[in-house]
Design a protein with these regions (language model features):
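Hydrophobic alpha-helical segments, principally membrane-spanning helices and signal/leader peptides
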Residues: 1, 29, 66, 71-73, ...
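Long alpha-helical, hydrophobic tracts
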Residues: 3, 8, 22, 70-77, ...
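N-terminal topogenic module of multi-pass integral membrane proteins
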Residues: 1-64, 157-161, 179-181
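Membrane-proximal helix-loop-helix units in multi-pass membrane proteins
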Residues: 72-143
Length: 181
């Protein structure tokens, strides 16, 4: 199930990065596409929580005592889903994007948890491969969301291009990690 979420998050970040780089002329088109891409994330989040993670698909973190790590993953993907829905509505209705910057700050703090929490378990509970995949995901998404905070909430307009390129390459890394799971 992590593959599903990381693939959609990577694709939506890839699309938003082209807007950050200035290649989209119409902001509403990005809003429609992001809203359309957020629907599977929202449905997957509800299905993942309702079906209690066993019936949907393969999970790399199949541990009996890992409720804290699973809850943190569900919260993390819920934050990203909320970010993309907020981003879609911001682009559709041409609102100010400072709110997206502050949501990115919350996601950046939670990325630190996702980066560090798998290393607190033993290797019998979480394998080194799963911990590595989660750590790569946490650090890549943490860097992207921190840069988005400094670009959107605090108006540092000089880092716009750098944020766009980090989002492009980070989303490609995220897609490769998702396919590696």
């Amino acid at each position: 199930m992590e593959t599903f979420f990381l693939t959609f998050i990577g694709l939506l970040l890839f699309l938003e990065s082209w807007k950050t780089l200035g290649f989209y002329i119409e902001s509403r088109l990005l809003g429609y596409i992001t809203l359309l891409g957020s629907v599977p994330l929202l449905i997957g989040l509800f299905l993942w929580e309702i079906l209690k993670l066993e019936m949907i698909g393969y999970s790399i973190l199949g541990i009996p005592s890992g409720t804290a790590i699973m809850l943190s993953l569900v919260l993390y993907f819920a934050l990203w889903t909320f970010y993309f829905i907020s981003s879609a509505l911001t682009h559709l209705w041409s609102y100010n994007s400072r709110l997206l910057g502050f949501i990115s700050l919350i996601i950046a703090f939670h990325s630190l948890i996702i980066f560090g929490i798998p290393w607190t378990y033993t290797e019998q509970q979480v394998t080194n491969g799963a911990a590595m995949f989660m750590s790569i995901t946490g650090i890549v998404l943490g860097i992207i969301s921190t840069m988005r905070f400094f670009q959107l909430a605090v108006p540092f307009r000089y880092i716009t291009k750098m944020t766009g390129w980090f989002s492009v390459f980070g989303s490609v890394i995220l897609l490769l990690v998702a396919q590696g799971i």
